């Protein structure tokens, strides 16, 4: 647990980077077109790679403050998409053009979809960015 406290921003950065690379893999190599809500979740996740990376490099204690709005927006969007996949009646108008936001391309174990992976990623990043490191508690 001590190493999580020490490297919490680096772990959050690795999760954001992995999420970015996996989403690009699905869309570019697997040719799975992302829906509008997936694009919005990407817009929340991709900047985290830079924000957390720069914050980690500069050892900025305020990096959590910079990353928090993006993680919250992404988390809300992923919860909404999980909801409309479970109950397709509530789909927004933006999801009616192009690829449907209720389309479930990946379904692991019967409940893990791409929006669920996004939700888990954003939630874990939120938890990690608010873990205080030893350096922050000593200052």
Curated annotation (Swiss-Prot):
The keyword Zinc-finger does not apply. The chain crosses the membrane at residues 6-25, 40-59, 66-83, 110-133. Its main location: membrane. GO terms for molecular function: protein-disulfide reductase activity. The keyword Transcription does not apply. It is a multi-pass membrane protein. Pfam families: DsbB (PF02600). It is found in: Cell membrane. Keywords: Cell membrane, Chaperone, Disulfide bond, Electron transport, Membrane, Oxidoreductase, Plasmid, Redox-active center, Transmembrane, Transmembrane helix, Transport. GO terms for cellular component: plasma membrane. Required for disulfide bond formation in some proteins. This is Probable disulfide formation protein C 2. It comes from Bacillus cereus (strain ATCC 10987 / NRS 248). The gene is bdbC2.
């Amino acid at each position: 647990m001590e190493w999580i406290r020490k490297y919490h921003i680096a772990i959050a950065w690795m999760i954001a980077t992995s999420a970015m690379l996996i989403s690009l893999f699905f869309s570019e190599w697997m040719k799975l077109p992302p829906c509008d809500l997936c694009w919005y979740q990407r817009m929340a996740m991709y900047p985290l790679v830079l924000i957390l990376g720069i914050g980690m490099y500069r050892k900025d204690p305020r990096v959590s403050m910079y990353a928090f709005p993006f993680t919250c927006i992404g988390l809300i969007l992923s919860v909404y998409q999980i909801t409309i996949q479970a109950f397709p009646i509530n789909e927004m108008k933006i999801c009616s053009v192009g690829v449907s936001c209720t389309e479930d391309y990946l379904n692991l174990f019967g409940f893990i979809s791409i929006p669920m992976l996004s939700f888990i990623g954003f939630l874990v990043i939120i938890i990690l960015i608010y873990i205080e490191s030893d350096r922050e508690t000593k200052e």
